[in-house]
Amino acid sequence: MNNRQINSLWSSIIIEELIRQGADFFCISPGSRSTPLTVAIARNPKARWKMFADERSAAFFALGYGRATARPAVLICTSGTAVANYFPAIVEASMDFQPILVLSADRPFELLECGANQTIRQENIFGSYTRWHMQLPVPSKEIPLKALLSTIAHAVVKTIGSPAGPVHLNQPFREPLEPEIPDLKDAWAAPLQEWLENGKPSGKSALPEKEPDAETLSLLREALAVAKEPLIIAGNMQKPEEAEAVEQLALELQIPLYTDFSSGLRLKSTTRPWQLAFASPHFTRHFKPDLVLHFGGHIIAKQPAAAIREWKPKHYIVVKNHANRLSPDHNVTLSIEASIASTAAKLKGCRTLSSGIINAATEEFFRRAEEEIDAECIGNKPVTEISAARLVSRLITAQQRLFLSNSMPVRDMDNFACSSHPHAIRSAINRGASGIDGIISTAAGFAEGDGKSTTLIIGDIAFLHDLNALSLLGAMTVPLQIIVLNNNGGGIFSFLPIAEYRDLMETHFATPQNYSIRSAAETFGLDYACPQTNQEFTRCYLEATGSPRSIIIELRSNRAENLHHHRALQARIETLTNHLYQGFIEKISEQPN
């Protein structure tokens, strides 16, 4: 075989084995050095692929795809800075345990660090953010092809294993790079004849979740048995069955359940918006759990963590399905690495000493607090960032998907969403590193992977940050409804102490942009709307979710007014809490010690 044939066969084997292992979606960015890989994908009828002019957008798209499918999309790029553009998405995938596989093309050894064009040190470029990395050899007949097969199979296992996350394979090629059909009867390929004919993966790996041991379960049951005021927290969950198991445990034991938006439970009618209660000092002063049982990852709101620091519960137990530390305040008393669903299921039947008063006392608070939020959504009132979150949470259906940007959109949905759905609404956020970069790309990948119409709520700065991702939407198989909360700047800074420094706030933090979102929609051939009232927004959103076309819905607001709306609503809820919890205090005092 000549070098073209060697490169072609080598690349075809890589791509075929990836597909057989379940990694059959490829995000390709054009480039010369990656020619053998790109050709192998193009000529494999089982490969699904999408082209990306921007590697950064490609990586976030792959991240979203992995979130939706729990399978890695494969990133293909040329040598040089192309692979470096993947870094932000790789960090997010690593920190939030999402599968993603990078297959970067590279120059061979003799072209490294000698001034050769478009050449950087690519090996292990992502450092500790990968679950596994491997510098593959230059394709050569000296390398047994079975070794290549087992390496590819292992790479897929590492990206979907426990914990899931990024894997990087760096593949150098020597020129010439153009394809040429290889001779499959060559002695080099002979050991693969059975693999070439049977269509099966070279090998499979079993990946069972770790079960909680008897001693750990005994410790948990003992702690629950003596708890007088327990609290369960449903944090970031990767699987619906995890969230369902935690919800069922809380319902059976009649323990208050704090459902973070990232748990997937926040919009269900069986849950309560404890976020509103935890935002009230009156509540946290009088509800002091002696046991906190936290399932899953970290949560969005700061108030529960602050309350736990103040309460100093006897037991603060975290159950998670990975070995990474989850104790930002260094106050966890027991950390358990085990299957979340299995652990929750095996705790059913436990008994606690809980009086149940907190559940009864808060029902009236929840009802009246929800009425206060609903008042923001009256039809002829101007649509606000609060009412937009509330209305979307009410109007979205189980057949649709929801993706939230970081910063204010995820906080408003976490705080003000309507818990009214009989079934969980599938949703996602990039909450690993909590950046605002790549949000449109991630939402697009999530929609593509899930195959469902998806609503994205995003701020204007995050929208601008990933503007070129709008070019992806025209070729999407499902539409996106992009709701842009345009307050002309970084609205979250209005809620932070830096807002008091008016000489710095606008120029160095809020950074207003003054770009036309309508023009962006026109540039990329997308539908556009700009409703003014809650009624107009409701009508516009319902029409958009029934359309096969993607749309940008711009909601214009003023940062100062938005801050006022939030503080006024919180003040009304705080007054309500103060009034209602006077009765709560009296009931607590009547309980025997």
From Swiss-Prot:
SUPFAM superfamilies: DHS-like NAD/FAD-binding domain (SSF52467), Thiamin diphosphate-binding fold (THDP-binding) (SSF52518)
Pfam family, any one: TPP_enzyme_M_2
Reaction catalyzed: isochorismate + 2-oxoglutarate + H(+) = 5-enolpyruvoyl-6-hydroxy-2-succinyl-cyclohex-3-ene-1-carboxylate + CO2
GO biological process: menaquinone biosynthetic process
Cofactor, free-text remark: Binds 1 thiamine pyrophosphate per subunit.
Enzyme Commission number: 2.2.1.9
Pathway stated in the Swiss-Prot or TrEMBL entry: Quinol/quinone metabolism; 1,4-dihydroxy-2-naphthoate biosynthesis; 1,4-dihydroxy-2-naphthoate from chorismate: step 2/7; Quinol/quinone metabolism; menaquinone biosynthesis
TM region positions: none
Family: Belongs to the TPP enzyme family. MenD subfamily.
Subunit comment: Homodimer.
Name this protein carries in UniProt: 2-succinyl-5-enolpyruvyl-6-hydroxy-3-cyclohexene-1-carboxylate synthase
Organism: Pelodictyon phaeoclathratiforme (strain DSM 5477 / BU-1)
Gene that produces this protein: menD
